[in-house]
Amino acid sequence: MNHMVEQNLGPVIGISVKDSERYCSIDEKNLLEEVAQDYCDQIIERGYRNVQLIGYSLGGLIALESARQLSEKGVNVVDLTLIDSMPVNYHFNTEVVLELIFITNLGITVEDLYNNVNNQDFKDFIALAYNEEKRTIDEEGILGVVDDRYAEVRSALSELISMSTEARFSSYSKVIKRVRNEEIRIEMLLDYYRIYKHNVNGSNITPMVYFGDIRLLHPIEPMEFVFLDTEGAEIIWDDICIGNLDVVEISGNHLSCIQNDKYVKELAEVIKKPIVDYLT
């Protein structure tokens, strides 16, 4: 956000979860709509009549719903930018797999937990365990995979499944300390995860069409551990967008595009373009 503030093109407001208990008490089926309503109320109360909305990953769906609601209330959405975002179209009926995806946001992966498991094998294993008919990933599917190529992955997941939640998060906390030299208390990790899980479950929707333009920013570097289908995302957003869908490539991968300072500076330049065009 600092790079955007330095551009001096208008107020820059970041919105995050302050009260996790209240946030997680919102019904998952209504999560996006209610959160977007809250965001819209704050924007309107501050008197903003022309806005740019930016949503990253799952936040893109909140940005989309906010854009829809603001447009209906007469606010001009100058630009809607989604950064590597798409709806979640499958269910996680096992905590372990979702936890292992969650910890990538904290800079560690299953490779850091188990030396004999690599991320690509984990992703391939999950593809085998995935129940396409039910669109679910569950423990039954994981334990039902019999393939010697992924014996280490199955063993690692079986071990994690057998552990208590507290024991798993204690392990994650220790690995974060070892790999990143960062201390995150187990209680805080659990709170972060609870919000993340709520976001994922709340994003398992088919969004209504949006009557406006969308910019979809796509990181050019693959990230083997993130379950994002780039081509599928473009198809989904093209169906949603009743307007112009502009797909723009940006530097980095799903995480580094917003964490690496060099990439973030480049991203800020990409983000500002429609605002500069609007102001001139």
Model-assigned labels for residue ranges:
Residues M1-T280:
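A hydrolase-biased, glycine/serine/histidine/acidic-enriched motif that marks catalytic-domain neighborhoods
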